[in-house]
Amino acid sequence: MTRKRTYWVPNSSGGLVNRGIDIGDDMVSGLIYKTYTLQDGPWSQQERNPEAPGRAAVPPWGKYDAALRTMIPFRPKPRFPAPQPLDNAGLFSYLTVSWLTPLMIQSLRSRLDENTIPPLSVHDASDKNVQRLHRLWEEEVSRRGIEKASVLLVMLRFQRTRLIFDALLGICFCIASVLGPILIIPKILEYSEEQLGNVVHGVGLCFALFLSECVKSLSFSSSWIINQRTAIRFRAAVSSFAFEKLIQFKSVIHITSGEAISFFTGDVNYLFEGVCYGPLVLITCASLVICSISSYFIIGYTAFIAILCYLLVFPLAVFMTRMAVKAQHHTSEVSDQRIRVTSEVLTCIKLIKMYTWEKPFAKIIEDLRRKERKLLEKCGLVQSLTSITLFIIPTVATAVWVLIHTSLKLKLTASMAFSMLASLNLLRLSVFFVPIAVKGLTNSKSAVMRFKKFFLQESPVFYVQTLQDPSKALVFEEATLSWQQTCPGIVNGALELERNGHASEGMTRPRDALGPEEEGNSLGPELHKINLVVSKGMMLGVCGNTGSGKSSLLSAILEEMHLLEGSVGVQGSLAYVPQQAWIVSGNIRENILMGGAYDKARYLQVLHCCSLNRDLELLPFGDMTEIGERGLNLSGGQKQRISLARAVYSDRQIYLLDDPLSAVDAHVGKHIFEECIKKTLRGKTVVLVTHQLQYLEFCGQIILLENGKICENGTHSELMQKKGKYAQLIQKMHKEATSDMLQDTAKIAEKPKVESQALATSLEESLNGNAVPEHQLTQEEEMEEGSLSWRVYHHYIQAAGGYMVSCIIFFFVVLIVFLTIFSFWWLSYWLEQGSGTNSSRESNGTMADLGNIADNPQLSFYQLVYGLNALLLICVGVCSSGIFTKVTRKASTALHNKLFNKVFRCPMSFFDTIPIGRLLNCFAGDLEQLDQLLPIFSEQFLVLSLMVIAVLLIVSVLSPYILLMGAIIMVICFIYYMMFKKAIGVFKRLENYSRSPLFSHILNSLQGLSSIHVYGKTEDFISQFKRLTDAQNNYLLLFLSSTRWMALRLEIMTNLVTLAVALFVAFGISSTPYSFKVMAVNIVLQLASSFQATARIGLETEAQFTAVERILQYMKMCVSEAPLHMEGTSCPQGWPQHGEIIFQDYHMKYRDNTPTVLHGINLTIRGHEVVGIVGRTGSGKSSLGMALFRLVEPMAGRILIDGVDICSIGLEDLRSKLSVIPQDPVLLSGTIRFNLDPFDRHTDQQIWDALERTFLTKAISKFPKKLHTDVVENGGNFSVGERQLLCIARAVLRNSKIILIDEATASIDMETDTLIQRTIREAFQGCTVLVIAHRVTTVLNCDHILVMGNGKVVEFDRPEVLRKKPGSLFAALMATATSSLR
């Protein structure tokens, strides 16, 4: 029998996919989700039909119904188990974590993966918990007011009931911990000294001890389970709440992508730790009270000396933890900066490679890492000292108490001493909880203060009014709008832009892909006194110079700006096409549908009017082709047309088009304008922002913007009659068109990255198939299986300094354990000597009374050895902490630098197939594990594992039978551990891998806020975030529960060793000295908790090593491109002098599994020439640029520059001699000067000269900081046109002999473009200039024209020759462009 089941599984591209039998599709946030049918299995479930509205069943116990059902001791398994077995667990199953047993057993039979793992319980999912958090916060605000509302109280209320149960279990744990040592063990020892005792009584005592230890184990395990599940719920609620607050804004200017990742990985985890570990304070306090009372009754007032030593640990632990948190705060600042720079470098890797900036940027990141490492060492040293202090403090406290007690000549016998030590055992365990609890609470407190800003953040002000007049679509009345901040303080104090110098006070524009065009960094309003009325069905044309406020006008309609005065009114639904297209990871169809229903006829019509048919035929899988992160394998024109198709398919009433025709050639531009804008959108209201003036005469209304004001408004004929600036622009356009026979502001052709990858099938056939194509662009992230290989540990040890260093660390840990055990043995030996007046004698039926050790004549000697041992233990512990901290941080830094250098040296094909979010997961999430968690767990594992071995050796001294039984139990435990750790490893790996799609989703959401809001997909993106968060939380909860599942069972089995020792003490070892019996029983009581802790921390340590495994996996994937410098080969002095470029039978393909894109190119470009490169989509023109920079290596043939084969020299030697002006303008965070001259190779005067040549001097001079004006992430505080001008200034400053201009003036108005062309001719005089798909005026002025087709040279001659040549392809392109002007 089969049943319907839905799974949401994260995939490598940042979305969710399934693996199973497809039943149906569901579009959410541009990604596809499936419903499956699976055979009955452990997690099969019955299909549940939705209940009719208003008939939802009310649980009999209200909100506590599910929790109270858990109190039923045994609950029969339902016929169809719930998706999460925890929901149907009874009390016994819950306490023993037995609900997880079927899944653990299944891991032995078959492979665990996303399909076989049950989904997260609805009680733990984001939906339910974020609603509860919202409700609790609203209640808090209604009671106390917004100013006095406490997030901490909301947190406490969120977990109040569960906290009460946790406290009850903690008290049970404390009572059970004291019951055995104080009441039962003395009876067992007393029984062992009797000659004739009741056997049943003795066995009963031993089993009573065993039972009390089992109760202790169960109560402690249950307490952890409650805390972990509560923390998962709060984590889900907090994450969803923050994301909902973040995404409600249509533009976010106060948080960058790196900072967003840092918040959702850092602060959210701090809150998780606070909820999970904070309740341990209750156990610690209860332990302190119980131990103080019991110790006083055993030994008297001197017991408080030991208690005082433990009490001193608490403020010491708090102090050290606060120091660690403070150091961690400073470390986080540097870490955030490193992650931000890494994110930008990976995003702009193509530009960095073409400009040979790898070494300087690698040095910047390595310097940040070096600074981060120093802070990590400070933080790690405090953490390590805290950990070691808590391990040795019981020994030191015991030594101080014994020394003072004996110095006061107070009575102390073996029975009194070990009863006292047994009483302190509980405090010994509880003291380990102090730093965990204090750190969790301290970190969560600071996270709460930062998170409170999300709570207190008011919703954005929606100023757009709905018009009542149905004849009007848009109305501006005296509207003045600005980009001033609307959501200050949204991120934590460590991440604020102003404090980190990322943005100045005036930088208040959105950081997404909108690209507002007004003058950046201006403190005044960007739009002044706008008065505008657009009738319904009207096409409004918007023109103006670069930075005049055109894009800001659209942003004002989208409610992304701040309305200072006046009003804005809209009537009808909106569609928006941004200047820089926003693409969702997935396939083309998903991007166009954007969650809408698939209508084939309408879909085909949209493809036709947006001129996508031919592109889909060229793409390997048609519209099902995966287009990668940010549309990596598409040209700018293809991305723009997909964005336009999305808008047209959405069928809205008002269309906001931000220069959509700038990224397409003349033929395509004319087709889109005629078929899409004029025909398909007929009857719709269209606001068309454009630099292509030839289309404005078809607009019903035209406005000309200048400095944020409407300087001209009317129809085309009206404005021409006024003979104002608009008329001058049009006349200039026609004058140039007449003189050159052609004037076009659109591009000749566009740049594809998947050139010539044509299918034999037709478009219609490609649209009929729904099968997911294989061999897609984005590589699926491979997850290792099974246990970690020795190779992982070997590489980590090598990174740490080698095996010699590891042996030194191991020696120090062995010494710590030896001194700890020696302290126990020496005290036992000392007690055995008694008063020294009577010789040691064996027990012969009466309890041995060796007298008061304070009366021993050699008291000073025993005290000296005991005290020196404690001092030596402290010194060794401090030295061990220092060395361990240095070594572990050296290892993580070495792995970081090695990975980064390897990734940096990868070819571009690597970055085309690996999402940036996945790489950031390595440099952020995985590295954080190596820096923060792995050192803590590995140090604890070393100490505890050696301690367990030492305890077993001591216990074995009592009897070889105990050793035999202990060995058998330990072997069983080891086999048990090895069998089931596979499942635990799978859970941890899945949790690690599930972070990548979550990161990608956050990045994608921040980049596309405008489109998300305008298409009404906010709820879809929130839902997807919740699904991704629930997937991660599910794996995290299963990992935590599985470690507790194994730890509990191992602890129960080690309790059997305690039972065995008790039986042997009671019945079998009368010849053993009494003091050694007592010592053995006291030590073995620590074995159960120590052994399970060793196993659990061992699992945690191995889980943290999966981060090393992932880093090594990426290192293995990284195949370096050619060396930067060739040994034994150097470029001629002053090369290249002429700039002559020769292609000789050149063949090229992008990757091994892709078609050839350049076929036998034979071409000679003479030095100092300007060559225009044109051709249709897929012709291979952009591939020439890739070949010239050796971003792709040749299959055959070669390229010569001034007679030098470019493959015979290093990449840096080649690329440093070339310059590029890219199609997509790239600016990095920093200053304007940094973006133009990142490494201070030019003077300020030279930079100002370059800015003057690109007509930016006036704009930059307005800023108070001039060249040191800050640039936010992605250059978000500059318009796209301004970014283009800065990129041109960068190339001018570089002054190379060969220049590649790749569609560099697409987003610049025609007047500025004319000036820029003059600048390029003057600045690059004497250089070889290759102009790919530039405006036709520039191509006509070139010395030669190269026409590409199907990866071959079709034509190459002077423009005037090609224009007159019959049948010339260039002439046909010119004719098409000319017709677009008519």
UniProtKB/Swiss-Prot annotation:
Keywords noted in UniProt: ATP-binding, Cell membrane, Cytoplasmic vesicle, Glycoprotein, Lipid transport, Membrane, Nucleotide-binding, Repeat, Translocase, Transmembrane, Transmembrane helix, Transport, Vacuole
Gene Ontology terms: cellular component: apical plasma membrane; cytoplasmic vesicle membrane; extracellular exosome; plasma membrane; vacuolar membrane
UniProt-reported outcome of changing residue 630 to W: No effect on glycosylation
InterPro entries: AAA+_ATPase, ABC1_TM_dom, ABC1_TM_sf, ABC_transporter-like_ATP-bd, ABC_transporter-like_CS, ABC_transporter_C-like, P-loop_NTPase
Disulfide bonds listed in the record: none
Cytoplasmic side: 1-163, 216-270, 318-383, 439-806, 885-930, 973-1049, 1096-1382
Job of this protein: ATP-dependent transporter of the ATP-binding cassette (ABC) family that actively extrudes physiological compounds and xenobiotics from cells. Plays a role in physiological processes involving bile acids, conjugated steroids and cyclic nucleotides, including cAMP and cGMP.
Name by which UniProt lists this protein: ATP-binding cassette sub-family C member 11
UniProt source species: Homo sapiens
